[in-house]
């Protein structure tokens, strides 16, 4: 019990200061919670892993929310391209794309498209420091025009003339296998120190719809390559090439993995850790040493595979 007035005043002053400190600490803690915008509009083919039904989030969203709960960030999901024109867009620490096609068109899923200004706002934001994570079909997005139905333009190296989105991302999807569409291949771990890959033994056998890609930015830091030696089909008649990488786009941290087609892969620890490490790096929660290693990790990266032969009827 506090008896004298002076002691009571000192006690109350200490309580007030302590209370203010706790309130400030609480506000700072809340302010430190970073948010990731999951954007899954499909102007082209709509993948099963991003399909939603009323009250049921997509496979990708479920995995990302699980990672968010473990790692202390938040996730908001949308298929509405108008988000990039809104003030809300600028509140995110990173965006996560699993998308297809020209997102400035309504396209397959009929959700509101991005505007041309919204696309530019995205690119400007990443250059200014927004994190960007792309999975699988994020490289099947904003193909360098024209993009005819026979995909012939995808077999041409456009280099600096590639679409600005693809330059930001670091590479472009050409095609994937047909028969078989899925193959188990050896994934070579080029950077076992990148977040999420600690303790992983290389190579890793992984079943996937493997994207064959081109127009790699030469400044990418290759994290994973796929070994094509045992793979079958025209898309893989090429040397090993990058399937997961990181790069800086101005001040923005960009991470991409070509994997993620199969629903079951979004539950496999190896892949979940790859995605989680990429997100945590993109939002700045962990660091990584980036080296421009594409010429060492994949010396034949620039080889473009042969086109599929015409289908006979």
Q: Model regions: which residues?
A:
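N-terminal secretory signal peptides and thylakoid transit peptides that target proteins
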Residues: 2-19
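Helical hinge/lid and interdomain linker segments adjacent to catalytic or ligand-binding clefts
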Residues: 4-6, 38, 46-142
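C-terminal segment of N-terminal export signals and the immediately downstream linker at the start
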Residues: 5, 26-45
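Catalytic beta-strand/loop cores that center a nucleophilic Ser/Cys/Thr
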Residues: 28, 167, 171-250
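Extracellular ligand-binding/catalytic regions of CAZymes and related secreted enzymes
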Residues: 40, 60, 66-70, 230-313
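Short, solvent-exposed loop/turn segments at secondary-structure junctions
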Residues: 43-44, 82-83, 101-103, 139-141, ...
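A glycine-rich, often tryptophan-bearing local segment used as a flexible ligand/cofactor-contacting loop or short
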Residues: 102-198
């Amino acid at each position: 019990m506090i008896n004298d007035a002076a002691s009571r005043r000192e006690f109350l002053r200490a309580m007030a200061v302590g209370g203010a400190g706790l309130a400030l600490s609480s506000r700072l803690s809340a302010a430190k919670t970073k948010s990731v915008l999951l954007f899954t509009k499909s102007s082209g083919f709509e993948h099963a892993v991003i399909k939603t039904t009323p009250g049921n989030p997509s496979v990708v969203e479920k995995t990302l929310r699980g990672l968010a709960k473990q790692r202390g960030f938040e996730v908001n999901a949308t298929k509405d391209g108008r988000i990039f024109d809104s003030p809300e867009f600028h509140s995110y620490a990173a965006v996560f794309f699993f998308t297809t096609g020209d997102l400035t068109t309504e396209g397959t899923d009929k959700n509101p498209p991005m505007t041309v200004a919204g696309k530019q706002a995205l690119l400007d934001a990443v250059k200014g420091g927004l994190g960007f994570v792309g999975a699988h079909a994020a490289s099947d997005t904003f193909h360098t025009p024209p993009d005819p139905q026979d995909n012939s333009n995808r077999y041409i190296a456009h280099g600096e003339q590639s679409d600005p989105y693809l330059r930001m991302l670091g590479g472009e999807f050409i095609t994937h296998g047909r028969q078989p569409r899925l193959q188990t291949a050896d994934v070579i771990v080029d950077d076992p120190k990148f977040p999420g890959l600690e303790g992983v033994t290389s190579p890793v056998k992984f079943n996937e719809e493997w994207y064959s890609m081109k127009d790699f930015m030469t400044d990418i830091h290759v994290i994973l390559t796929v070994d094509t030696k045992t793979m079958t089909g025209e898309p893989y008649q090429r040397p090993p090439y990058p399937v997961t990488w990181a790069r800086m786009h101005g001040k923005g941290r960009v991470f991409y993995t070509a994997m993620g087609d199969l629903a079951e892969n979004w539950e496999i620890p190896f892949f979940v850790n790859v995605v989680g490490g990429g997100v945590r790096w993109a939002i700045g929660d962990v660091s990584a040493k980036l080296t421009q290693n594409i010429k060492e990790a994949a010396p034949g990266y620039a080889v473009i595979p042969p086109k599929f032969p015409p289908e006979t009827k």
